[in-house]
């Protein structure tokens, strides 16, 4: 009799364990079904599901206000999730069956590379917008998404795998109804950490940031360079002769300007980036111009020509020497950047860039009034009166 009771107890224990295991398996299957359904919708580019987990504003939380978004913006998430994939590694259901945790492996785009490309393109747009005096806001939500759209359409990014945990809760009463708990970490994981990278103020280093500034400068036209570098006295003019000189100088920049970064020093939110700048040799241009001008002013023609013609001929000589120049010079120039908590930014860029690129030609050496040359003498142009580069660092 005792033996029979023991067997009955043992069988009941086995049955209870089996039932528990079965229930646990059912619970895990239910949880897995919810996860699979939701993530498959992401894979299939269901816009409602995308917006459910990633709101437009959450990628760029610093942008204030809302705006209607174009079809190109809608397309960003379709392009982003086209290679999205996942694998459920483990599911753990709580004993009270009210919560569950799932561990997954997600396959997403290399969002660090995407974010660095975005930061580069966004900075380029901001620089050119400032140089053009454009009314368009490069920091608007739509402008930012249009950059992402262009990058995702025109560039190929590798896929990377990351581990992700997901929390679920049972919202049912009579029957189990599992629901994925939306959190910042989950949203960030679903987009491969893009939210973290886009908010990283150090994603572009000071050296990389300066590289964007200098490369963008190479692409500027006459008006953009004039506005951006703040040298309107030389480049921004309605005078036809001076306009020709300004255009020739910009052409010299396009043909000769280059740079090499030799090192950097970062102290907290301040950085110094040392470079070797190569540009046209303004000193050679001025020396040749001054010699030819002296020869002309000492000639009888200068007296006969009168003040206005002497002025016009001086401009012609300067233009000729700029256009014919093939001499370059390489000089060390230090640039200073500050991290404002959003990104690294070049400080006093107009002053440091204009002096580094144009040297002594940051202002015209041609005197407006040539009356002082009536007796054949000349008023020497002094480099001491020219723009002096300020090598002083920011104050600590």
Each language-model region and where it sits:
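C-terminal motif of bacterial Sec signal peptides marking the signal peptidase cleavage site
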Residues: 19-22
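Bacterial N-terminal signal peptides that target proteins for export
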Residues: 1-10
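Charged, low-complexity helical/coil segments in non-catalytic cytosolic or luminal regions
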Residues: 217-224, 268, 281, 293, ...
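Short beta-strand edge/turn micro-motifs at domain boundaries
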Residues: 113, 120-201, 295-309, 323-374
């Amino acid at each position: 009799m005792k033996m029979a009771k023991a067997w009955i107890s043992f069988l009941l224990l086995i049955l209870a364990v089996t039932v528990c295991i079965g229930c646990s398996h059912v619970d895990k299957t239910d949880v897995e079904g919810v996860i699979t359904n939701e993530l498959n919708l992401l894979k299939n580019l269901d816009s409602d599901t995308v917006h459910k987990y990633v709101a437009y504003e959450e990628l760029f939380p610093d942008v204030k206000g809302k705006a209607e978004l174009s079809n190109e913006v809608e397309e960003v998430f379709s392009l982003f999730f086209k290679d999205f994939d996942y694998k459920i590694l483990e599911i753990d259901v709580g004993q009270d069956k009210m919560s569950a945790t799932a561990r997954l492996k997600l396959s997403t785009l290399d969002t660090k590379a995407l974010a660095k490309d975005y930061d580069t393109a966004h900075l380029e747009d901001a620089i050119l917008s400032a140089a053009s005096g454009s009314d368009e806001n490069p920091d608007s939500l739509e402008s930012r998404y249009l950059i992402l759209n262009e990058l995702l359409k025109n560039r190929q990014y590798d896929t990377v795998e990351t581990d992700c945990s997901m929390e679920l809760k049972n919202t049912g009463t009579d029957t189990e109804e599992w629901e994925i708990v939306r959190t910042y970490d989950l949203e960030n994981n679903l987009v491969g950490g893009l939210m973290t990278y886009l908010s990283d103020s150090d994603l572009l280093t000071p050296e990389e940031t300066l590289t964007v500034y200098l490369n963008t400068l190479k692409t500027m036209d006459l008006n953009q360079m004039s506005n951006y570098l703040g040298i309107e006295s030389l480049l921004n003019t309605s005078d036809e002769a001076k306009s020709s000189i300004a255009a020739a100088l910009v052409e010299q920049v396009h043909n000769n300007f280059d740079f090499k970064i030799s090192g950097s020093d970062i102290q907290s939110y301040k950085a110094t980036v040392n470079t070797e700048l190569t540009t046209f040799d303004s000193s050679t241009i001025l020396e040749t111009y001054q010699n030819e001008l002296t020869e002309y002013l000492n000639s009888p023609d200068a007296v006969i020509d009168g003040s206005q013609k002497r002025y016009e001929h001086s401009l012609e000589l300067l233009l000729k020497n700029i256009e014919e120049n093939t001499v370059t010079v390489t000089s060390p120039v230090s640039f200073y950047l500050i991290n404002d908590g959003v990104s690294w930014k070049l400080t006093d860029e107009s002053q440091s860039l204009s002096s580094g690129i144009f040297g002594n030609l940051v202002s015209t050496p041609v005197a407006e009034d040539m009356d002082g040359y009536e007796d054949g003498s000349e008023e020497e142009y002094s480099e001491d009166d020219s723009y002096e580069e300020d090598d002083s660092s920011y104050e600590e």
